[in-house]
UniProtKB/Swiss-Prot annotation:
CDD domains: UDG-F1-like. One of its GO terms (biological process) is base-excision repair, AP site formation via deaminated base removal. This is Uracil-DNA glycosylase. The gene is ung. One of its GO terms (cellular component) is cytoplasm. It comes from Acinetobacter baumannii (strain ATCC 17978 / DSM 105126 / CIP 53.77 / LMG 1025 / NCDC KC755 / 5377). Its main location: cytoplasm. Gene3D superfamilies: Uracil-DNA glycosylase-like domain (3.40.470.10). It catalyses: Hydrolyzes single-stranded DNA or mismatched double-stranded DNA and polynucleotides, releasing free uracil. The active site is at D77 (proton acceptor).
Length: 237
């Protein structure tokens, strides 16, 4: 793809890991991205507080390069409370109380694999091993859940899934809840494993369909079957 000087300048301003930047270039130069960039600029001009901090917006992609991805855990949008969101789906900064969904995830992990329940909710260790912790929408206004939906992020993360779908094989996609499952309809089930369950939020999980889903052991079993190093799900103390 031959780029103009203007396009190269636009790409240089995107703080994104190189393998992702190369693969997502058509989208990064699309009208969707222009519109999204304008929206975020307007939000900052209006002095809105946006989570996560700008340097962490692309954390999921920056920590887990394209050729390192083994697993994708798809979330909806970032936590909207202070100091929570760190750019990884379901993850929170160290020192922040565990959100209810993450408590339930840790409970299921303990039941499934006997992994001790972590006292902190920073999932960076998973991301560093190849777990792409991807929200569908990558930003949110403080205290306003879902406030940045339908501004272009959904199309961006669809493009991320399409790149993985087309360029990689034997990835495990973990889709909790109807929202993630709808977004995951584009995944080729002949090349990849798709695991579905209810959402880990208390409202959904307590209705049934999340506890006992055993996605962590099923993920590692599939990876091992395909000669891929399994994930060490235990977080550091």
């Amino acid at each position: 793809m031959q780029l103009t000087e203007q396009q190269q300048d636009k790409l240089s301003k995107v703080q994104l890991e190189e393998s992702w930047k190369r693969s997502l270039t058509p989208f990064l130069l699309s009208p969707y991205m222009d519109s999204l960039r304008d929206f975020l600029f307007q939000q900052k001009q209006a002095q809105k507080t946006i989570y996560p901090p700008s340097k962490q917006i692309f954390n999921a992609l920056n920590i887990t390069p394209l050729d390192h991805v083994k697993v994708v855990i798809l979330g909806q949008d970032p936590y909207h409370g202070p100091n929570q969101a760190n750019g990884l789906s379901f993850s929170v900064q160290r020192g922040v109380a565990l959100p209810p969904s993450l408590r339930n995830i840790f409970h299921e992990l303990h039941t499934d694999l006997g992994v001790p329940v972590s006292r902190h909710g920073d999932l960076t260790k998973w991301a560093e091993q190849g777990v792409l912790l991807l929200n569908s929408v990558l930003t949110v206004e403080a205290g306003q859940p879902t406030s940045h939906q339908k501004q272009g992020w959904e199309e961006f993360t669809d493009a991320v899934i399409d790149v993985l779908n087309e360029q990689r094989e034997h990835i495990v996609f973990i889709l909790w809840g109807a929202y993630a499952q709808r977004k995951g309809q584009r995944i080729n089930r002949e090349k990849h494993l798709v695991l579905t369950a209810a959402h880990p939020s208390p409202l959904a999980a307590n209705r049934g369909g999340f506890f006992g889903c055993k996605v962590f052991s099923k993920t590692n079993q599939y990876l091992k079957q395909h000669g891929i190093e399994p994930i060490d799900w235990q977080l550091d103390a």
